[in-house]
Amino acid sequence: MAAGVKAAELRELSEEELVTKLREAKAELFNLRVQAATGQLDNNRRLQVIRREIARIYTIMRERELGLSAAPTEVTAG
């Protein structure tokens, strides 16, 4: 995953893509925590970046649930 995904970029994704990103971020966070526990983690900052990315994804999902923002709609040419 890219370091520090912006909220504007995440808002352009569909619900399925957000769920996929969330799953990937959680898996990466788990791996980073294992590395930290075993003393193999090189970049401690990456833990915070991933945690914030997860929080951004949850926030966008909640905004859509409450109707504060809408999921992007597909525009068909024609």
Curated annotation (Swiss-Prot):
Could you identify this protein by its name? Answer: Large ribosomal subunit protein uL29
On the tree of life, the source organism's domain of life is Bacteria
GO biological process, any? translation
One of the record's GO molecular function terms: structural constituent of ribosome
- GO CC term, one of those recorded: cytosolic large ribosomal subunit
Q: Which family does it belong to?
A: Belongs to the universal ribosomal protein uL29 family.
Checking Pfam families in the record gives:
Ribosomal_L29
- Mind telling me which InterPro entries this protein's record contains? Ribosomal_protein_uL29, Ribosomal_uL29, Ribosomal_uL29_sf
Q: Which UniProt keywords apply?
A: Ribonucleoprotein, Ribosomal protein
What's the gene?
Answer: rpmC
